[in-house]
UniProtKB/Swiss-Prot annotation:
Its main location: membrane. It is a multi-pass membrane protein. It is found in: Cell membrane. Keywords: Cell membrane, Membrane, Transmembrane, Transmembrane helix. Belongs to the UPF0391 family. InterPro entries: DUF1328. NCBIfam families: PRK13682.1-2 (NF010227), PRK13682.1-4 (NF010229). It comes from the Bacteria. This is UPF0391 membrane protein A1S_3910. GO terms for cellular component: plasma membrane. It comes from Acinetobacter baumannii (strain ATCC 17978 / DSM 105126 / CIP 53.77 / LMG 1025 / NCDC KC755 / 5377). The chain crosses the membrane at residues 6-26, 30-50.
Length: 52
């Protein structure tokens, strides 16, 4: 999931450099959402591993 977040962040960067504001904003939003979900799942995984 971190890989997809990085991919969308790179797409947003390239789109913003080329002047595609809408695509850049949408890609940035997807990257942020995926990054937050990945961090939450990682924290849940670390907590659940510690209890077993």
């Amino acid at each position: 999931m971190f890989r997809w977040a990085i991919i969308f962040a790179v797409i947003a960067l390239i789109a913003s450099l080329l002047g595609f504001g809408g695509v850049a904003g949408l890609s940035k939003d997807f990257a942020v959402i995926l990054l937050v979900i990945a961090v939450i799942l990682a924290v849940i995984g670390f907590i659940s591993r510690g209890r077993t």
